[in-house]
């Protein structure tokens, strides 16, 4: 059906797409998970209310989520070049993917943790659990299913973003789709 050259190109594109998607999701969770936990705990009905911290994080997350990815990708080119040394390719694409994914993840985590029954948290407090114990042994455990669903949604979102990155040389399947499917109109590769 396809020549060996096309198959090699597609396999390389799949590899680059997986590299960008998984790498950005992992680093996105490194940033977004603590942000989401902090937002939940510092909310007015959280276990350690702090309006100032919550408002700052809420504004950061809202701004981060409201910027369209393609615009963010272009805006972050200088930062990407400073961090990676170039602003194109699959490794360089991870930087804007992480910056875009982290606020999304933070909101997903916040939403998941807010679903935890307040009675369970109150029971842990009454038994003398510390804030860290409530977070790690009650909230994260009780929200486990919702958090896993959040990971799958995040992976799908980041995968879509990585395809968009191909429009400006981000590599992966998005790059192949633009170069061969759109510019050359080779429908068989699409």
Q: What positions do the PLM features span?
A:
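Short membrane-interfacial helix/loop motifs at transmembrane-helix boundaries
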Residues: 1-8, 168
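Primarily residues marking transmembrane-helix entry/exit sites
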Residues: 6-10, 186-187
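Transmembrane alpha-helices
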Residues: 131-162
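Short helix-to-coil transition segments within interhelical loops
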Residues: 113-143, 183
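Membrane-water interface segments at the C-terminal ends of transmembrane alpha-helices
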Residues: 9-114, 149-156
């Amino acid at each position: 059906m396809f020549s060996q050259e096309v198959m090699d190109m597609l396999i390389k594109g799949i590899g680059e797409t997986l590299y960008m998607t998984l790498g950005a999701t992992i680093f996105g969770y490194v940033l977004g998970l603590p942000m989401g936990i902090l937002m939940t705990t510092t909310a007015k009905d959280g276990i350690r209310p702090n309006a100032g911290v919550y408002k700052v994080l809420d504004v950061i997350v809202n701004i981060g989520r409201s910027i369209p990815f393609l615009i963010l990708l272009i805006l972050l080119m200088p930062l990407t070049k400073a961090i990676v040394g170039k602003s194109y390719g699959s490794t360089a694409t991870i930087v804007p993917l992480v910056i875009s994914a982290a606020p999304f993840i933070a909101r997903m985590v916040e939403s998941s943790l807010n679903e935890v029954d307040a009675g369970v948290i109150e029971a842990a407090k009454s038994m003398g659990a510390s804030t860290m114990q409530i977070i790690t042994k009650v909230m994260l455990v009780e929200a486990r299913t919702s958090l896993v669903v959040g990971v799958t949604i995040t992976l799908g979102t980041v995968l879509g973003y990585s395809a968009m990155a191909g429009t400006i040389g981000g590599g992966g399947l998005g790059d192949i789709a633009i170069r061969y499917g759109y510019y050359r109109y080779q429908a068989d590769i699409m």
